[in-house]
Swiss-Prot record:
Part of the twin-arginine translocation (Tat) system that transports large folded proteins containing a characteristic twin-arginine motif in their signal peptide across membranes. Together with TatB, TatC is part of a receptor directly interacting with Tat signal peptides. HAMAP family: TatC. The Tat system comprises two distinct complexes: a TatABC complex, containing multiple copies of TatA, TatB and TatC subunits, and a separate TatA complex, containing only TatA subunits. Substrates initially bind to the TatABC complex, which probably triggers association of the separate TatA complex to form the active translocon. It is found in: Cell inner membrane. Keywords: Cell inner membrane, Cell membrane, Membrane, Protein transport, Translocation, Transmembrane, Transmembrane helix, Transport. GO terms for cellular component: TAT protein transport complex. Pfam families: TatC (PF00902). This is Sec-independent protein translocase protein TatC. GO terms for biological process: intracellular protein transmembrane transport; protein transport by the Tat complex. GO terms for molecular function: proton motive force dependent protein transmembrane transporter activity. The keyword Transcription regulation does not apply. Its main location: membrane.
Length: 270
């Protein structure tokens, strides 16, 4: 085989990767253009919890001349990525799937769907539940001599980080179930360390949310529920000891058969 023939598969993979990246960027660009046409409406939706907490007649500000423009660009870009998500996953799947086994293909698709579901639930929880109470707490420091004047850039950065944080936190059941599937944790381990997990949840809620007991409880309770869901997932999909023993037995049988086959020719010669 010539050197050019050896390089051709690698070159083909690079060409396919380039084409799929180009299509992904085009999809994001189309989503960005569509989102930019509704930039003000999208920003109004994002700031709705804050405006509701501030009261009627209140407005946000921008402290630099290009701040509003760049804020709208960022909102449109984030929305464009969300709109292009189906295309991005499709291109990623079509590039990766040929190298996966059939069992792995069956496992990947449900994981992707569940990860998107949990992320959306977490972000929605932060937007609809935590944001209103958190903003009311922060705005409570206003007085006759102090007035809150949040800027567009500041709010976009804060809201984006918080929504991403809530989305990733709600991936907890999926992560622990995957770890149980790999044999890294067990149901007994999760049950035994439940009290430490609860302590971590309340500590994390105190750090992430405003120093308000109600808001901290509202953040910690869903995490406790997610932890219990993780235990159920680990029990159903976790790695079983019986399966490990069966796999070890099968491997030993295969090795025994192989050693028998290797010794048979020598016995025939004797």
């Amino acid at each position: 085989m010539s050197r050019e023939e050896e390089k051709s598969p690698f070159t083909e993979h690079l060409g396919e990767l380039r084409d799929r990246l180009v299509r992904s960027f085009i999809a994001v660009g189309v989503g960005f253009v569509i989102a930019y046409c509704f930039k003000e409406r999208l920003f109004d939706i994002l700031t709705a919890p804050l405006i509701a907490a501030m009261g009627e007649g209140q407005k946000m500000i921008f402290t630099g001349l290009p701040e509003a423009f760049f804020t709208y660009l960022k909102v449109s870009l984030l929305t464009g990525v969300i709109l292009a998500t189906p295309v991005l996953f499709y291109e990623f799947w079509m590039f990766v799937s040929p190298g996966l086994y059939r069992k792995e293909k069956r496992f990947v698709l449900p994981v992707v769907i569940l990860s998107i579901f949990f992320f959306c639930v977490g972000s929605s929880f932060g937007y609809f539940i935590v944001f209103p109470y958190g903003f009311q707490f922060f705005l409570g420091f206003s007085s006759d001599t102090i007035q809150a004047m949040p800027s567009m850039k500041e709010y976009l950065g804060f809201a984006s980080k918080m929504l991403l944080a809530f989305g990733f936190v709600f991936e907890l059941p999926l992560v622990l179930t995957f770890m149980a599937r790999m044999g890294l944790v067990s149901v007994e381990f999760l049950k035994k360390n439940r009290k430490y997990a609860i302590l971590i949840f309340f500590t994390g809620a105190a750090l992430i949310t405003p120093p308000d007991v109600v808001t901290q409880i509202m953040m910690a309770i869903p995490l406790m529920i997610l932890y219990e869901i993780s235990i159920i997932g680990a029990r159903v999909f976790g790695k079983k000891k019986d399966s490990d023993e069966e796999e070890a037995a099968e491997n030993s049988d295969v090795q025994t058969d192989k050693s028998t086959d290797d010794t048979t020719p020598g016995e025939d010669q004797n």
